[in-house]
């Protein structure tokens, strides 16, 4: 035909067999990518420290998605929780990867078969003998099957009736594990952070899909509606499919970026809003107050803070700190976290406890300012020493650590105090290994950031694709200059197939 590159997909118009073939091949590529990517990630993933070097710090992208629906063990003998595993069973990380690759191969063979044997009687209209697809019926079949799958996932997999459940954690991402979840049928089911809503929504949406599928299988569309929405034209299917995909992409970009029960912070890392709102800082403060109420010393109180919780309260784990075009995992930026130095507490010579003002998300540099509990500035690291009134040297600031590796250690040397004050701007202070990965010290985003950016971007592109193909199918006659009264049935009941000399033409 000599088609330009942007029109090559017209070869599958009026060719149901090869339309099916290219969709099989597309699914083979998607499944093959998923399996191959999983094997690659498993080859580079280090499961040895789930607290300070979790999957999201290592830039894992598909492992978190497997984990959130119940895969936690590896044939390599490790578990995501850090336990040793003797028998991981068939549905290990590697088992899931292998199954996707096997499926990809089978789909590849099916695609070749349908490309070769494209002219099946199944695809021919009995009345006219021409290639034809009953698109409303196909829509009903797909709706019914996806409804069954959706219902089955909610009613069996998530609830644990026949399946492992899903990843469930506490609000601070400390106690996460895979467990069965009961559906939440009340108003709480609409809370995006309630796991029970995932089960109930899958069950409800599945039932709706099954009923809608049966409806579309048993009821034919009215002729006026069929013609108005161009239901006989396969480009209508393309347009509405793109609409469904871009809508879903926008939704998941939101649930990923703002956080939800479907995107646990143990698997995808914290959200930027948890840093902006001091979410983990407030929980740590609450725990310290509770310990002090039990007459524990500051050292004992801070020693009870889980290292995992302290690590969340560090700006380097904020997905908005990494630039969108800085490639690589978080570990390639600030390094592999080795240990928590402890909580730095600053005091001036008058005995006021001072708090370092934390860096906001979108700042690369920020003045080092120390305030008392009433927010009054008591000390700083001045830009111009000649005019300074609150410098660390003048105010006599000291720092003492509680909990962590430097528990009980204090420093009064101004240079050391300023060093830790600068680091306290970034939240809790950790020691990092930057040598192993040759980390460059520049923050990277977590998979949460990459997923959001990718899905929001593609959703926007697909939105325009929906408008484009929707306009093409609704106004095809206008664009093509074809007489609207043309009665020859071509291209699934619409108009002439571009470049195909065999379709009937209107006599000039």
UniProtKB/Swiss-Prot annotation:
Primary location recorded for the protein, binned into one broad class: plastid
Keyword Oxidoreductase part of the UniProt annotation: no
UniProt entry tagged with the keyword Thylakoid: yes
Membrane topology: Multi-pass membrane protein
Record keywords, A-Z: Chlorophyll, Chloroplast, Chromophore, Membrane, Photosynthesis, Photosystem II, Plastid, Thylakoid, Transmembrane, Transmembrane helix
Cofactor binding, per record: Binds multiple chlorophylls. PSII binds additional chlorophylls, carotenoids and specific lipids.
Gene3D superfamilies tied to this protein: Photosystem II CP47 reaction center protein
Residues making up the signal peptide according to the UniProt record: none
GO cellular component terms, semicolon-separated: chloroplast thylakoid membrane; photosystem II
Subcellular location field: Plastid, Chloroplast thylakoid membrane
GO molecular function, one term: electron transporter, transferring electrons within the cyclic electron transport pathway of photosynthesis activity
A Pfam family annotated for this UniProt entry: PSII
Top-level taxon: Eukaryota
General function of this protein: One of the components of the core complex of photosystem II (PSII). It binds chlorophyll and helps catalyze the primary light-induced photochemical processes of PSII. PSII is a light-driven water:plastoquinone oxidoreductase, using light energy to abstract electrons from H(2)O, generating O(2) and a proton gradient subsequently used for ATP formation.
Family membership: Belongs to the PsbB/PsbC family. PsbB subfamily.
Quaternary organization: PSII is composed of 1 copy each of membrane proteins PsbA, PsbB, PsbC, PsbD, PsbE, PsbF, PsbH, PsbI, PsbJ, PsbK, PsbL, PsbM, PsbT, PsbX, PsbY, PsbZ, Psb30/Ycf12, at least 3 peripheral proteins of the oxygen-evolving complex and a large number of cofactors. It forms dimeric complexes.
Protein name: Photosystem II CP47 reaction center protein
Species the sequence originates in: Angiopteris evecta
Phylogenetic placement of the source organism: Eukaryota, Viridiplantae, Streptophyta, Embryophyta, Tracheophyta
């Amino acid at each position: 035909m000599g088609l330009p590159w942007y029109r090559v997909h017209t070869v599958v118009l009026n060719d149901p067999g090869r339309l099916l073939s290219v969709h099989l091949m597309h699914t083979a590529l998607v499944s093959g990518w998923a399996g191959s990517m999983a094997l690659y990630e498993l080859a580079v993933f280090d499961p040895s420290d789930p607290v300070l070097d979790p999957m999201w710090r290592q830039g894992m992208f598909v492992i978190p998605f497997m984990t959130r629906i119940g895969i936690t063990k590896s044939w390599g003998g490790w578990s995501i929780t850090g336990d040793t595993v003797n028998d991981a069973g068939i549905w290990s990380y590697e088992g899931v990867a292998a199954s996707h690759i096997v499926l990809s191969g089978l789909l590849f063979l099916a695609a070749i078969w349908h490309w070769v044997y494209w002219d099946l009687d199944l695809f021919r209209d009995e009345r006219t003998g021409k290639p034809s697809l009953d698109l409303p019926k196909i829509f009903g079949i797909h709706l019914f099957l996806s409804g069954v799958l959706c219902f089955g996932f909610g009613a069996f997999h998530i609830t644990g009736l026949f399946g492992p459940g899903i990843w469930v954690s506490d609000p601070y991402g400390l106690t996460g594990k895979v467990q069965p979840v009961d559906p939440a049928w009340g108003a709480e089911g609409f809370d995006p952070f309630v796991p029970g809503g995932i089960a109930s929504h899958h069950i409800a949406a599945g039932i709706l899909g099954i009923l809608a599928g049966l409806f579309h299988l048993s009821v034919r569309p009215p002729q006026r509606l069929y013609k108005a929405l161009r239901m006989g034209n396969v480009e209508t299917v393309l347009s509405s499919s793109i609409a469904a995909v871009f809508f879903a992409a926008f939704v998941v970009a939101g649930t990923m970026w703002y956080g939800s029960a479907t995107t646990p912070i143990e698997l995808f890392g914290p959200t930027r809003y948890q840093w902006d709102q001091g979410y983990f800082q407030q929980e740590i403060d609450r725990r310290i107050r509770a310990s002090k109420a039990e007459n524990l010393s500051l050292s004992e109180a801070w020693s009870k803070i889980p290292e995992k919780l302290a690590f969340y309260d560090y700006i380097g784990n904020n997905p908005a700190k990494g630039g969108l075009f800085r490639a690589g995992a978080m570990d390639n930026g600030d390094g592999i976290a080795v240990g928590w130095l402890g909580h730095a507490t600053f005091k001036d010579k008058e005995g006021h406890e001072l708090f370092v003002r934390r860096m906001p998300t979108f700042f690369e540099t920020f003045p080092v300012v120390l305030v008392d509990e009433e927010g009054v500035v008591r000390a700083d690291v001045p830009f111009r020493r000649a005019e300074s009134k609150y410098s660390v040297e003048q105010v006599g600031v000291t720092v003492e650590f509680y909990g962590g590796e430097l528990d009980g250690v204090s420093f009064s040397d101004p240079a050391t105090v300023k060093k830790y004050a600068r680091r306290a701007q970034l939240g809790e202070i950790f020691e990092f290994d930057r040598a192993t990965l040759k980390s460059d010290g520049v923050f990277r985003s977590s998979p949460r950031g990459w997923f959001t950016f990718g899905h929001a971007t593609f959703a926007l592109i697909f939105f325009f694709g929906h408008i484009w193909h929707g306009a093409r199918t609704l106004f095809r006659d206008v664009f093509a200059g074809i007489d609207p009264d043309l009665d020859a049935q071509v291209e699934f009941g619409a108009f002439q197939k571009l470049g195909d000399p065999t379709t009937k033409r209107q006599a000039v």
